[in-house]
């Protein structure tokens, strides 16, 4: 009984407290309770590291510095008595974006500008008393993108250019000289290959049987002459035109040789008694062979007796 009354009184007190606090705003902090590190203003008695304002005769976004009592490393402006390492301006006779350097007493390694007689993007160097390895420009007689080197006294390993290439006419002259030398080397070999065939055809006066046995020798000379003709035909592209002209002359000489000298065809086997006649018939059956440069050959295996 006593406990229930005590609990009911406690609940009544809590409800009254809740009704009294309902609808009231929370207490706000007063301005005098703000800490010093959270307060920023432009008062004259502020610490130098926390005080910033603008000059009275300069735009707000262009000039900023600290109080006069601030150290020089934290103070920046364009005054004429500023340190040379922190002072930068442009020359009076140069565009603002192309020419920048430090004070007149700055070291040469920190002073850069462009030459007055060169484009801004192609020629750059340092002060006149700078080291030669730090000075670069282009040659006056070369394109800007192909030839670059340093000062005139620079080592040759830092100078690059393109070597000279022989022209197309010189290459053709070299190739034609090699072809002429090869042709002169092959011509004596062709004459040596056709020589034994000429000698073997005229010395058969002993008898018909020996002349008949000596008949299979000309095909060897003909094969050597044909092999030489293929090599020479590759070297001379106008072989077909020359072969047609020489073919007509050889046919004319061959007919003239048989009509005007009837004894020459039988003279090879003169003492043999009919051996030369069989030899002439064998050559007539086979026909006239072809040899040097695709031309026709006579019975002794040479072109009208001249050889290849």
UniProtKB/Swiss-Prot annotation:
Expressed by the venom gland. Residues 172-228, 252-279 are annotated as: Disordered. The modification Pyrrolidone carboxylic acid is found at residues 39, 51, 63, 75, 87, 99, 111, 123, 135, 147, 159. Residues 172-182 have a biased composition (Polar residues). It is found in: Secreted. It comes from the Eukaryota. It holds the Pfam family ANP. GO terms for biological process: cGMP biosynthetic process; receptor guanylyl cyclase signaling pathway; regulation of blood pressure; vasodilation. Residues 210-227 have a biased composition (Low complexity). In the C-terminal section; belongs to the natriuretic peptide family. In the central section; belongs to the pHpG family. pEKW and poly-His-poly-Gly peptides may serve as metalloproteinase inhibitors during glandular storage. Their inhibition may be instantly disengaged, by dilution or physiochemical change, when venom is injected into tissue of the prey. This is Snake venom metalloprotease inhibitor 02D01. It comes from Echis ocellatus (Ocellated saw-scaled viper). The lineage of its organism: Eukaryota, Metazoa, Chordata, Craniata, Vertebrata.
């Amino acid at each position: 009984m006593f406990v229930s009354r005590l609990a009911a009184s406690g609940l009544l007190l809590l409800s009254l407290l809740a009704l009294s606090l309902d609808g009231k705003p929370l207490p706000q902090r007063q301005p005098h309770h703000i800490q010093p590190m959270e307060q920023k203003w432009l008062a004259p008695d502020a610490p130098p590291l926390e005080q910033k304002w603008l000059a009275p005769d300069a735009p707000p976004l262009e000039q900023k510095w600290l109080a006069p009592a601030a150290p020089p490393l934290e103070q920046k402006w364009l005054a004429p008595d500023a340190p040379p390492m922190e002072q930068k301006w442009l020359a009076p006779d140069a565009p603002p974006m192309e020419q920048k350097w430090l004070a007149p007493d700055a070291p040469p390694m920190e002073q850069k500008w462009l030459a007055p007689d060169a484009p801004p993007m192609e020629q750059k160097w340092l002060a006149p008393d700078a080291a030669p390895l730090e000075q670069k420009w282009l040659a006056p007689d070369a394109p800007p993108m192909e030839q670059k080197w340093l000062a005139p006294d620079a080592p040759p390993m830092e100078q690059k250019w393109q070597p000279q290439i022989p022209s197309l006419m010189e290459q053709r002259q070299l190739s034609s000289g090699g072809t002429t030398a090869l042709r002169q080397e092959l011509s004596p070999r062709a004459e040596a290959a056709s020589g034994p065939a000429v000698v073997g055809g005229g010395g058969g006066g002993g008898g018909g049987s020996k002349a008949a046995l000596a008949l299979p020798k000309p095909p060897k000379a003909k094969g050597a002459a044909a092999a030489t003709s293929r090599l020479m035909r590759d070297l001379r592209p106008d072989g077909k035109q020359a072969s047609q002209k020489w073919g007509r002359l050889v046919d004319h000489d061959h007919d003239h040789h048989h009509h005007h000298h009837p004894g020459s065809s039988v003279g090879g086997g003169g003492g043999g008694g009919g051996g030369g006649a069989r030899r002439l018939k064998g050559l007539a059956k086979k026909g006239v062979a072809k040899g040097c440069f695709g031309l026709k050959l006579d019975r002794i295996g040479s072109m009208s007796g001249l050889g290849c």
